[in-house]
Design a protein with these regions (language model features):
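Well-ordered alpha-helical scaffold segments within catalytic/enzyme domains
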Residues: 1-3, 41-55, 93-106
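Low-complexity, Ser/Thr/Pro/Gly-enriched N-terminal "stalk/linker" regions
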Residues: 1-38, 49-73
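Carbohydrate-binding/catalytic loop surfaces
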Residues: 24-42, 72-98
Length: 106
């Protein structure tokens, strides 16, 4: 496998992720300001693979700041505020994947 070649080919996707990360650390799913925790975590995995640690750390901090006392996170955010006021049980534990990815690289 030519790891460097694949990383190079996917660099535009990484640039898109970085461009769509807001100052609060959330990573927008689209240009309209939507952010959902599942897609956010997938973007964190990419940031870890590319060792973009500043953006990665901001994204992890955003995720944990938005967990409630029960360890759940709202299903969707729009322009930095919750827009769907319910929880999907698989969103909160998904953060383990970007954390594990980072631990494998560090």
């Amino acid at each position: 496998m030519n790891w460097d070649k694949y990383k190079s080919l996917l660099r535009p996707a990484l640039d898109w992720i970085i461009k769509n990360q807001l100052n609060d650390g959330s990573i927008q799913w689209d240009e309209k300001g939507k952010c959902d925790p599942w897609d956010h975590c997938e973007c964190l995995i990419a940031l870890a693979i590319y060792e973009e640690w500043e953006a990665y750390d901001k994204g992890v901090e955003w995720f944990f700041k938005n967990l409630n006392d029960d360890g759940l996170i709202f299903s969707e955010y729009q322009n930095c505020k919750p827009s769907k006021f319910y929880f999907e049980c698989h969103h909160a534990p998904y953060i383990i994947f970007p954390l594990k990815q980072a631990s494998l690289l560090n």
